[in-house]
UniProtKB/Swiss-Prot annotation:
It comes from Pseudomonas aeruginosa (strain ATCC 15692 / DSM 22644 / CIP 104116 / JCM 14847 / LMG 12228 / 1C / PRS 101 / PAO1). The lineage of its organism: Bacteria, Pseudomonadati, Pseudomonadota, Gammaproteobacteria, Pseudomonadales. One of its GO terms (cellular component) is plasma membrane. A motif (HXXXXD motif) lies at residues 310-315. Its EC number is 2.3.1.15. HAMAP family: Glyc3P_acyltrans. It is a peripheral membrane protein. It catalyses: sn-glycerol 3-phosphate + an acyl-CoA = a 1-acyl-sn-glycero-3-phosphate + CoA. One of its GO terms (biological process) is phospholipid biosynthetic process. SUPFAM superfamilies: Glycerol-3-phosphate (1)-acyltransferase. GO terms for molecular function: glycerol-3-phosphate O-acyltransferase activity. It comes from the Bacteria. This is Glycerol-3-phosphate acyltransferase.
Length: 834
């Protein structure tokens, strides 16, 4: 410290060395407009100990002709060796720092005024800011090192000086007169505390005005987690089960809390805004946002939980970016621990990410700390964001929700429901997803790769491609209290137990998960790539004459305008031909010209990738496609028959695709679709019977192409039932049936030349079997073997006969029958060998 001559000499050398690089100025000429009485002692107060900050203040005082902080100052009969002090005391020689203590210089000054007859002393708060205000800075590199609210280490301070030192700003604030405070007559100790409090509030308000608000709750929250009763209980149990000391268990809990907690930083939020503004404009052609007013309507007085669909890694940042740009607080975002990589993890954490392990199983202490952290966010009103699908969807479908985070949220609300929780679904639709090539490999069966920091460099190569637009639709909010009122009307009066785990929690959480998934799908952004993929993948060779493709796209648009999927869903502008031109400009379509015109098709690579974009909106077209399917093998069908078989099949389509309509609403919605199909001349109505067009007509082709949108889904349903019926009662477990379905689907895809790996996706069969169990069509015995209702075969054949062509049904039955024959041959060979 420059309190003595030899130290002042060293300080002077340091200041001259510093100013070989640093350039500083006062904010609003504040050093020149100070109204100080030079006949009375003047001392400067800085918030934190920093020699570099002091050197800058000393330089600005010299430039303005003010008393220098490093020079002695007379205080009555005494001499202070330097005219400055730090609000936070300097650390001792062991590096320890008493943040609650008062500066000895301030104590002496106050005593001189209050007890020793000194007329007055003037305290001038001074703040040093390295670099411009985050709101004014446009360099992402400088924003990354800009002043923030976190305590700065020496290396970071050095980096800040080197990067931001050319634009250093100093704010001199109006002097505080100690005489005015002493005359309030509160006594020495209380006046000392009051001065400290005034200075703390002053520095905080000034810092907020210059660098933005302190968005971080980390410094106080992390230690507070360990004082929570449920965490204390978990620490005690950890001590007993692991036979470790209380101190060690607390250290483990503190390590978990630091691993989890986010560390919001306003400069980093600005840094990400600058980077992402460039990114969206460079890679994507902007972001289209719909229904954001729904968030603005519920933001006041509610705890907001954003639940986006998960298609890409950039989903993490996209929502925060949009909310920040629209004047809403960015949320705390749940991110997988695999993203806590060097450098990137730190940026994400300061951008609002909190990190969670993939599994909490068997670690009660981690579970308690994580649950308490999330409860603290909710109870304090911090908006949050997590992905109910868990991971990114590699197929483009809405993945079946994972209920872990929803269960934690629900339990937190049961624990403290004073602040209402509102879920806001956010549908994110890409015309070309950044990880498309990676997904292509995984769709073809490649092993899922672990994320790495080096994956970021792959983005550079993608910048040359055209990625179109990003669509972000905010769905209809779900009010948790209203949801509970519907499903557990007396939830507020129940004894929920010390851990808030009522018996109905799992079932209610599952219902909530399905509601969230349906609301997400309700907000689908239907874009040109989705529609073109849907149309071309419905053909046998993924190819259509350009005029025919334009007609079917016009049909899709007309149908969706006549029967909108939901008030939250959006459609692209333009007609079919405009959509084709747009998709061609993205190099997603190949073309071949001949004398009759132009044929547009998907090459092998784009055909597989197109399944991803088709699946984004398959739920939107599933019901009209199911209706059209009834006319593949039937020239006419009565409304009564159509409704009966549609009701039989719909629950499975709804469960797989999270379609919005309940079974009670189904008849009315089908009537709307039938009317729309009649209006487009795809069907003709005679009394209560609907008749398809002549097979040679253009309308018939359009109807069949629409039907084929769900053909593969219906084939998978029929496949599982055929294998189950062939095996007989109590012959297969659910896992065995799932494996058989996968093998059978692979064989059929080879036999029929299907280039669609998701056709034999194991998870789709697993969820179909689970739906059969949920609807009590199947039952498990004590050994886990499956039995089925006696009428299952009759119902399955009756429905399949009406929605699947005869050759497909025959092919599935033949492959299903081959399995018993193969097993019999294997048993015969084993017997002969013995």
């Amino acid at each position: 410290m420059p309190r003595y001559p030899f130290r002042r000499f060293g300080f002077g050398a340091l200041r001259r060395l510093l100013y070989l690089w640093v350039r500083s100025e006062t904010i609003n000429q504040s050093a020149f407009t100070l109204k100080i009485d030079r006949s009375k002692p003047v001392l400067y107060v800085l918030q934190q100990p920093s020699v570099s900050d002091l050197a800058v203040v000393d330089t600005e005082c010299r430039k303005a002709g003010l008393p220098r902080p490093v020079m002695p100052v007379a205080v009555g009969d005494a001499i202070e060796p330097a005219a400055f002090f730090y609000l936070t005391p300097e650390p001792d020689w062991l590096g320890r720092q008493d943040k609650r203590g008062a500066s000895p210089t301030l104590v002496r000054m106050l005593a001189a005024v209050g007890q020793n007859g000194l007329d007055d002393a003037q305290i001038i708060p001074v703040s040093v800011f390295w670099g411009q205000s985050p709101d004014s800075e446009s360099s992402p590199w400088k924003l990354l090192f800009a002043d923030n609210w976190a305590v700065t280490g020496r290396l970071r301070k050095l980096a800040r000086i080197l990067i931001l030192g050319r634009k250093t700003r100093v704010q001199f604030s109006a002097p505080i007169h100690l005489r005015e405070l002493v005359e309030q007559g509160k006594g020495h100790e209380r006046t000392l505390r009051m001065v400290n409090r005034i200075l703390r509030v002053h520095f905080r308000n000034l810092k907020t005005a210059v660098i933005g608000p302190d968005l971080s709750h980390r410094r106080n929250l992390v230690k507070g987690l360990l004082r929570a009763p449920l965490v204390r209980q978990a620490i005690s149990e950890e001590c007993e089960s692991e036979r470790i000391s209380q101190e060690k268990a607390e250290g483990i809990a503190l390590r978990y809390a630091n691993e989890i907690a986010s560390d919001f930083s306003y400069p980093v939020i600005r840094f990400l805004e600058v980077i992402l503004s460039w990114f969206w404009n460079k890679l994507y052609e902007g972001v289209k946002v719909n229904h954001i007013e729904r968030v603005q309507d519920v933001a006041q007085g509610n705890e907001i939980v954003y639940v986006p669909c998960h298609r890409s890694h950039i989903d993490y940042l996209l929502l925060s970016y949009l909310l920040f740009r629209n004047g809403l607080t960015p949320p705390h975002i749940a991110a997988g621990i695999n993203l806590n990589m060097p450098v990137i993890g730190s940026i994400l954490r300061r951008g609002g990410a909190f990190f969670m392990r993939r599994s909490f199983k068997g670690n009660q202490l981690y579970t308690a700390v994580f649950n308490e952290y999330l409860h603290t966010l909710f109870s304090r009103g911090f908006s949050t964001e997590y992905f109910v699908e868990g991971g990114r969807s590699r197929t483009g479908r809405m993945l079946h929700p994972r209920t872990g985070m929803l269960a934690i949220t629900l339990r937190s609300f049961l624990r403290d429901s004073r602040r209402p929780i509102v879920f806001v679904p956010v549908y994110i639709g890409y015309e070309r997803v950044l990880e498309g090539r990676t997904y292509l490999g995984e769709l073809r069966g490649a092993t899922k790769k672990k994320e790495s920091i080096f994956d970021l460099f792959k983005v550079v190569g993608a910048l040359k491609q055209r990625f179109g637009q990003v669509w972000v639709n905010f769905g209809e909010p779900i009010h948790l209290d209203q949801f509970l009122d519907r499903h557990q009307p007396d939830w507020q009066d129940q004894d929920l137990g010390p851990e808030y785990r009522p018996d109905w929690l799992p079932q209610t959480t599952n219902l909530l998960a399905k509601d969230v998934a349906r609301h997400l799908n309700d907000a689908a952004a239907i874009n040109p790539v989705n529609l073109v993929a849907l149309a071309l993948l419905s053909t046998s060779r993924q190819a259509l004459d350009e005029s025919a493709l334009a007609r079917i796209l016009d049909l899709y648009l007309a149908l969706l305008r006549k029967v909108p999927y939901s008030p939250s869903a959006t459609l692209p502008d333009g007609d079919g031909q405009a959509l084709i031109e747009y998709v061609k400009s993205m190099n997603l379509l190949a073309e071949q010209k001949d004398a009759l015109g132009r044929i547009l098709y998907l090459d092998e690579q784009n055909a597989v990738l197109a399944t991803y974009y088709r699946n984004n909106v398959l739920h939107v077209f599933a019901l009209p496609a199911l209706i059209a399917s009834f006319f593949q093998s039937n020239s006419r069908i009565s409304r009564e028959q159509l409704l009966r078989f549609a009701r039989a099949l719909y629950p499975y389509l709804q469960a797989e695709l999270f379609i919005r309509w309940s079974l009670d609403e189904l008849d009315a919605v089908i009537d709307q679709w039938l009317a729309a199909l009649v209006e487009q001349d795809l069907l003709r109505q005679e009394n209560d019977t609907f008749i398809r067009p002549a097979p040679s007509s253009r309308q018939y082709v359009l109807l069949i192409l629409l039907a084929r949108s769900v053909t593969q889904t219906l084939q998978r349903f029929y496949m599982a039932i055929a294998l189950l019926l062939n095996a007989g009662q109590n012959a297969l477990t659910a896992e065995e049936l799932e494996n058989l379905c996968t093998v059978m689907a692979q064989r059929l895809s080879i036999l029929h030349g299907l280039n669609a790996p998701e056709f034999f996706d194991k998870s789709l069969f697993r969820h179909f079997i689970q739906t059969l169990l949920d609807l009590r069509v199947l039952r498990k015995d004590e050994a886990g073997k499956l039995s089925y209702h006696e009428l299952l075969g009759e119902l399955a054949e009756g429905a399949a006969k009406r929605v699947l062509p005869a050759e497909i049904r025959l092919s599935i039955r033949q492959v299903a029958l081959e399995r018993p024959a193969e097993e019999a041959a294997a048993e015969s060979n084993d017997a002969a060998a013995n």
